[in-house]
Amino acid sequence: MLDGKAFHSFTRGLKKPFDEILVKSMQDTMKYLCENIQGCVLGYTQSDEITLVLVDYQSRDTSAWFDNNIQKMASISASMATLAFNRAFEANSKDILRRINNAPTCTTEEDRYAGVLERCISKGAMFDSRVFTVPKEEVVNTLIWRQQDATRNSIQSVGQANFSQNQLHKKNCDTIQDMLFVEKGINWNDYPTHLKRGSCCIKVTVKVNEGTEQEAIRNKWVIDNEIPIFTQDKEYVNKLVMI
């Protein structure tokens, strides 16, 4: 499990409740990790965290990443995430920075946002990593735990973007949703799925060079923005680990 280090400071000034560049950069980072970490079968991201599921029992010849050396797995994965995220964040910021910087005029908000993006790129982000082992039967419960946290984070983020800290004091998620709907006309359920409960990176089979002599089947990592509620569809996770 990887977490952005001091992301409260790093993300200060980004768009609220959800910044498209930040969300896309986290997904790109997750995809890079899934593609480059041995034994990875699933990635899940929400907020500033990424959870990776690694297995070492796919076949008799399968070996564990770094022989399950926890210290090395943690340090290398954190370094990989830091590298991938900073690269992705800069790439994902380029178009909007180019548009704002090349425009003959821009709004105060656009100018402010460009400054925030440039600060983020200059400062860079860092990640921490924790590695732990769970029985394969418990993997889905770990993902359920993270997804439920994602839902809480999402509701609270929308609440914080629309109400003061005093207004939200001691308010639970159901109450915040009611406040948003009644007082602001915002239905939290209308937000895209990946902003409400996170997104996954999964491997799918695709045809390449279709219709030619070189046609073949390949595996490809893709982002799934329409993941199910894991308590209602445990098979989404279990089919990848119960092998």
Question: For the regions a protein language model found, what residue spans apply to each?
Answer:
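Regulatory and interdomain segments flanking nucleotide-handling catalytic cores
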Residues: 1-243
